[in-house]
Amino acid sequence: MFLAAALLAACGGTPAPLTHEAYIWQRQWTPALRGSVAASRDFVAAWRVLAAQASRDGRVQVFTADNGALAAAGRPVIPVVRIDGRLARFDATALRAQVVGVLTRWPGAAAIEIDYDCPTARLPAYAAFLRELKPALGGTRLSITALPTWAGSADLDALLAIADESVLQVHAVQAPQAGLFDPAIAASWVSAYATHTHRPFRIALPTYGSRVSWNDDGTLLAVESETAALAAGASASELYASPDAVMAFVQGLEAHRPEGLAGIVWFRLPTPDDTRAWSLATWRGVVTGHLDRAPLRTRLRDAGQGASDVLVENPAATDAAAPSRVALPPGCMLADGIDGYRLAPGTQPLTLVAGQARPLAAHATRAVGWARCPPGTPTTLTLQGTPVS
């Protein structure tokens, strides 16, 4: 975090506190989603809601939001139109009509956002599209998302001059091998980006994890961040945005704030149904700068017939990264891992190691394996480390 702070320190002073907004990316408005909107309205300044999506083949899908739930939350709403960065044919006229159509369905919108992760070489064409789109918005503010890789282009400044504001994405930008979020790299991206824009900008930060699946030859098969693990590759790993690392990054931004930085946009609003996102309590803790922490506990639980379940417990009110290793007591003769854990070969004492282990939710107990140990074996185990986010 020292490198992050150093990189950001050169960017400016310390104006008013950063505001916190959230993306609502869920397609279905479930009771859990409505509950999350209501529960977080006290610290969320605005909602950015997925309103439409243009897929790779050009088809546009429009999503229906719960306007009642949004109105009850009493915060500004910004509909987002997502355009697939791999779009085969960019029909500017048709897309412009779709964006204007979305805006007519959101008459009270505080702005409209275009989320288009286009290749850097297409920035001039994208700028031309935005230049023609803006007059059609009738005075509604225009926001766009941006990628750190664009900072190396001479065309970026012209693009950013068109939009009223932008949102820089600093999560899940690199290859999956690099993880979801690296604070030092993100800080360097923010520092570079701030030199290209003279309009307000925000930073998109993650509240989620991803499961990455690989083929036998080591090539990437799938990255699953919003759905259950469906891909069946030869191997898989769980990536996790550490709440502690993200909170420290935000605190660094607040202490050494780049000029023009208006706030944070969190991707995405956590709900109890979202098994790949932080809990609401964890997200609130990161935003407020106070994470409730307590050491994880491990123990054996009698499972009958001489076997025991290996349990890991999180007594804290916020999520915790799963331990990277769980060492069983000396004398245990057989063991194996479950739910993302496996038995490390040739270890004494027998040790379970994490491969795909998911974060441990607040106040949760999870079985991570089983063991056969002699009667009277101590039930307290040894755990260490956390996976790298």
Feature map (PLM): residue ranges:
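Substrate-binding cleft of secreted/luminal carbohydrate-active enzymes
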Residues: 208-210, 214-294
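Bacterial signal peptide processing site
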Residues: 12-14
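Catalytic domains of carbohydrate-active enzymes, especially glycoside hydrolases
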Residues: 30-57, 105-111, 259
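Asparagine-centered strand-capping/turn motif at beta-strand->loop junctions
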Residues: 302, 309-322, 328
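Chitinase-like catalytic core of GlcNAc-active glycosidases
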Residues: 17, 22, 51-168
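Substrate-binding surface in catalytic domains of secreted glycosidases
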Residues: 124, 128-235
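Short, acidic/polar
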Residues: 28-40, 91-105, 150-157, 243-254
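Conserved, mostly hydrophobic/aromatic
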Residues: 47, 114, 166, 203, ...
